[in-house]
């Protein structure tokens, strides 16, 4: 949520209450999304979603106090395994989210386009310019010549 506070207008962040987010996740489940919670010692500390219809991985979050423990990598690897029908799953990430960008690149994802541009000059919900990039998983090298 800190990333949202850094780039989104306060009114936009405040509108994303727990109740509003539950409604949004319920709507997305109706569109083919499945969500998985990660817990450590029975305490939820991460979430990831996958869409079997499109091969998209989304809603990958790790609580601030749980970061740096490999949970994000575990969740991403889990999500990839949940999408065997999509050899090149994809996700979207803000280019200003450097921590997530580093993880995704280490896990074999590479830029494959821009989905949105958030520009405060044209978008009242944005407080700073950033791009939402599409990253797609690269196929492993086959090793054949």
Spans of features found by a protein language model:
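Conserved glycine-rich acetyl-CoA-binding loop
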Residues: 43, 59-77, 94-102, 106-107
């Amino acid at each position: 949520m800190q990333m949202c506070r850094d780039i989104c207008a306060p009114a936009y962040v405040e509108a994303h209450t727990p109740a509003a987010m539950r409604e949004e996740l319920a709507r997305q489940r109706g569109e083919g999304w499945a969500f998985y919670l990660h817990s450590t010692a029975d305490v939820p500390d991460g979430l990831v979603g996958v869409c079997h219809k499109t091969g998209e991985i989304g809603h990958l979050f790790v609580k601030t106090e749980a970061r740096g423990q490999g949970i994000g990598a575990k969740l991403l690897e889990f999500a990839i395994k949940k999408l065997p029908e999509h050899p090149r799953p994809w996700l979207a990430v803000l280019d200003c989210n450097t921590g997530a960008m580093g993880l995704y690149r280490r896990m074999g994802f590479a830029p494959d386009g821009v989905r949105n541009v958030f520009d405060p000059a044209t978008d009242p919900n944005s407080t700073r310019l950033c791009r939402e990039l599409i990253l797609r998983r690269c196929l492993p090298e086959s090793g054949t010549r």
